Amino acid sequence: MALPLYDSQPARRVPWVTYLLIAVNVVVFLLTPMSNFAAWYGNGSVRECKATHFTFEYGAVPKELTTGDQQPLPTEVVHDCGPAGFRKAPWTTAFTSMFLHSSALHLLGNLVFLFVVGMGVEDRLGRWRYLLAYLAFGLVAVYGFAWTSPGSTVPLIGASGAIAGVMGAYVILNPRGRVVSWVPPVIVIRLPVWVVLGYWFVLQWLSLGDEKSNVAYTAHIYGFVAGVVFALLARRAGPAHRLAALSRG
């Protein structure tokens, strides 16, 4: 798989919102028990249990989103880590889950894609429309995943659904763009954006039946499609509308 490194077409202005989203995701990760940086959570099994409770508290549990009711923790979690000591409004987790990551590698993988495609989409949409679109893509991805697996009590976390939406929008808003990508083991090549992101989308689709994976491929697909649809509508709005948006951003 080709890993995108940077957009060969530089942005026309500083992508402050993309930088802000990257910074927020990094800071949130460092302050959660999933990060070794947050030493105040303890070590070993204590940290693992706090990370588990934290994930269930702020992650998006499909059954909670579809029913509107907080669900009890799984029996094995209660056995190993004790009962939940929190109450939550399930709908809020559709937002909070977008900023949680299970590991530094999970975080890095998401932010690489956001860095590459986010700047271009922000450049074309304007800062506020881009920020609102990012959050909307994330919501579509989270709720799409929940509707597809309404009985699941496994929390969904990660920014990948929202970032997938940005990727879908990028393909439409910059169809002739090229992305400098790393093809393992040593090849660095400039590829058309539709090749890199189209290949990524096909991989997500083909991986839907992988029951052993803990990757939310369905959320990725919902987010990507939401980004494509949004960008098509934005493009149809006309050049004047887009220029006005750019001047406001």
Where are these regions (language model features)?
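A detector for small-residue-rich transmembrane helices and their helix-helix packing motifs
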Residues: 1-249
